[in-house]
UniProtKB/Swiss-Prot annotation:
InterPro entries (alphabetical): C-type_lectin-like, C-type_lectin-like/link_sf, C-type_lectin/snaclec_domain, CTDL_fold
Additional remark text: Shows greater sequence similarity to the beta than alpha subunits compared to other heterodimer snaclecs.
Gene3D superfamilies referenced in this protein's UniProt entry, alphabetically: Mannose-Binding Protein A, subunit A (3.10.100.10)
Keywords from the named record: Disulfide bond, Hemostasis impairing toxin, Secreted, Signal, Toxin
GO MF, one example: toxin activity
Organism: Echis ocellatus (Ocellated saw-scaled viper)
Taxonomic lineage from the root: Eukaryota, Metazoa, Chordata, Craniata, Vertebrata
Keyword Signal in annotation: yes
Tissue: Expressed by the venom gland.
Disulfides per UniProt: 27-38, 55-144, 121-136
Protein name: Snaclec 27
SMART domains: CLECT (SM00034)
Quaternary organization: Heterodimer; disulfide-linked.
Length: 148
């Protein structure tokens, strides 16, 4: 049977491979982990307002996804494309007061910008990492983000 320490490390290797990229014990089943947050891609089509509401109603709370660096954008874009095979998802950015005062739906200030200056709610293309505005009343698939 061999040495128990080698069995333990073989077992750990199996767990690491099965858990996959973005899997974490701190996130609920079906959610992916990245830098202390949990993310889930939803295939339902909802307006921006309905998608944001849906995110806040999840068991771990949350909001439509917000981005604070390029690595986070890349993680979410890859996650969205892998799960949906779709190219557009809502993100939590919109001009709440229609005065170009941009903030995320969770109240965080915009500290990373990846679009040209145009108003409305925003989507991200999961191919090409481009952010574009859409009418908030249109329906898209979406990504929720919550603290781990």
């Amino acid at each position: 049977w061999g040495d128990s320490s080698s069995s333990a490390s073989a077992c750990w290797s199996c767990f690491s491979l099965v858990s996959g990229i973005g899997a974490d014990q701190e996130c609920p089943p079906g959610w992916s982990s990245h830098e202390g947050h949990c993310y889930k891609v939803f295939s339902e089509y909802k307006t921006w307002v309905d998608a944001e509401q849906y995110c806040t109603e999840q068991e771990n709370g949350g909001h439509l996804v917000s981005f604070h660096n390029r690595e986070e954008v890349d993680f979410v874009v890859k996650l969205g494309y892998t799960i949906l095979k779709a190219d557009i998802v809502w993100i939590g950015l919109r001009d709440f007061w229609r005065e170009c005062h941009w903030e995320w739906s969770n109240g965080a200030q915009l500290d990373y910008k990846g679009w040209s200056d145009e108003p409305n709610c925003f989507i991200v293309y999961t191919v090409g990492n481009k952010w574009l505005h859409r009418k908030c009343s249109s329906t898209q698939q979406f990504v929720c983000k919550s603290p781990a």
